[in-house]
């Protein structure tokens, strides 16, 4: 059952590997929803939790995603609190199931190595459009 929660109430429960799903309201996001027939326009992966913020001495969550944010485009790591505060659309937290968490824990070194290799890659607009075409293909 989906339940709406404030970010500050759930942030401490997030763990690396959890999925954050976004459903934007921009023109591009609405087009993506139409062509993919999905409420989700892109996803991010929680990479690190409880990383100390040197300015406030508090902890925060980081996510990795392929997006356009703060004038940059591509695969990047962002503070989840900043994404939540500035995102125009819906956001869902999808924690890993117990079985998936167990598999993740057994393979997390390879997972993180793969993810860090993706950081900084450019946004692949052609692949994005190709994905949308695949979604509407009836074959």
State where each predicted segment sits.
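A structural signal for well-ordered alpha-helical segments within the folded catalytic domains
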Residues: 15, 38-41, 109
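Short, surface-exposed secondary-structure edge patches
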Residues: 8-13, 35-37
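Loop/turn positions that initiate beta-strands
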Residues: 16-20
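Short, structured beta-strand/loop micro-motifs enriched in basic residues and often containing a Trp
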Residues: 1-5
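Glycine-rich catalytic cores of cysteine/serine-nucleophile enzymes that process amide/ester linkages
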Residues: 22-103
């Amino acid at each position: 059952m989906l339940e709406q929660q404030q970010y500050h109430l759930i942030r401490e429960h997030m763990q690396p590997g959890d999925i954050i799903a976004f459903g934007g309201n921009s023109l591009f996001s609405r087009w993506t929803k139409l062509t993919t027939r999905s409420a989700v326009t892109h996803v991010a992966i929680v990479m690190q939790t409880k990383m100390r913020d040197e300015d406030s001495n508090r902890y925060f969550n980081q996510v990795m995603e392929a997006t356009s944010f703060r004038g940059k485009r591509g695969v990047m790591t962002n503070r989840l609190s900043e994404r939540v505060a500035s995102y125009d659309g819906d956001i869902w937290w999808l924690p890993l199931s117990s079985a998936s968490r167990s598999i993740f824990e057994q393979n997390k070194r390879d997972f993180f190595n793969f993810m860090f290799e993706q950081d900084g890659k450019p946004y692949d607009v052609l692949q994005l459009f190709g994905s949308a075409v695949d979604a509407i293909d009836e074959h």
